[in-house]
């Protein structure tokens, strides 16, 4: 058997495609690259990526994390380490990654990066969260950042943490 990756991309905020006409295709490529960094079980693996605006992300951040402010990317993992598909052969539902346009665009500008490069980093970052990576302590952060940097370097994108 093999792994089939299904990525649903929803773009309710048209500013994304105005700024990056290839945003939808880019999401698919980036998610596949991040998913390729881990051993996935045979079968179908599904996730969604939503390219939203700040207001949408602020509402989600407030409702789910208790933080009433927008953020660049949110990840909502569907599974924890003990979860498995309920029905044998059912798709493995990883979860959702949601990005906020205004925050991402402002960060890219402030950091002297292209929106495409910053977007690439945040999609990879969000998908890695769905796979169980986190940055709650220094050790976890170092592992996650090293993997992000490696994956992005393969795309010709500079280390997003290099100037921090």
From Swiss-Prot:
Single strand-specific metallo-endoribonuclease involved in late-stage 70S ribosome quality control and in maturation of the 3' terminus of the 16S rRNA. Belongs to the endoribonuclease YbeY family. It is found in: Cytoplasm. Keywords: Cytoplasm, Endonuclease, Hydrolase, Metal-binding, Nuclease, Ribosome biogenesis, rRNA processing, Zinc. Its EC number is 3.1.-.-. The keyword Hydrolase applies. Gene3D superfamilies: Metalloproteases ('zincins'), catalytic domain. Its cofactor is Zn(2+). This is Endoribonuclease YbeY. Its main location: cytoplasm. GO terms for cellular component: cytoplasm. Zn(2+) binds at residues 125, 129, 135. Disulfide bonds: none annotated. GO terms for molecular function: metalloendopeptidase activity; RNA endonuclease activity; zinc ion binding. GO terms for biological process: rRNA processing. InterPro entries: MetalPrtase_cat_dom_sf_prd (IPR023091), YbeY (IPR002036), YbeY_CS (IPR020549). The keyword rRNA processing applies. Coiled coil: none annotated. Binds 1 zinc ion. The gene is ybeY. It comes from Paramagnetospirillum magneticum (strain ATCC 700264 / AMB-1).
